[in-house]
Amino acid sequence: MPKIITTRYYEKKLNVFKPKHPELKEKYAKTIKLLQADPWHPSLRLHKLKGNLSDLYSISLNMKYRILLDFIIKDDQVFLIDIGDHDGMY
């Protein structure tokens, strides 16, 4: 089971995101729990990004919102980098 690590930037973005989207509170908690249990679960829609963000991966909160992350597979760690809407993050 990978260890979930949040960056300071991610925490700041999350503190802005959560109050704006209270309807996603349960979905967010479920997504993070699933990410920790099985990062490759199909419902997360995990995929590697391209272009300037090619070192990162993305998972879906829903069809509009994403969480950017970085895998350190060797150490079994997942770093949460950013959270926001699909268009604003890419």
Descriptions of predicted regions:
Residues 3, 12-17, 22, 61-90:
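Enriched for short, Lys/Arg-rich terminal
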Residues 6-7:
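PIN/NYN-family metal-dependent endoribonuclease catalytic core
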Residues 22-25, 54:
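Short functional linear motifs
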Residues 30, 51-54, 69-73:
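Short alpha-helical linear motifs
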Residues 32-35, 66:
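Hydrophobic alpha-helical segments with strong N-terminal bias
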Residues 34-59:
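A short, surface-exposed loop/turn module that caps and links secondary-structure elements
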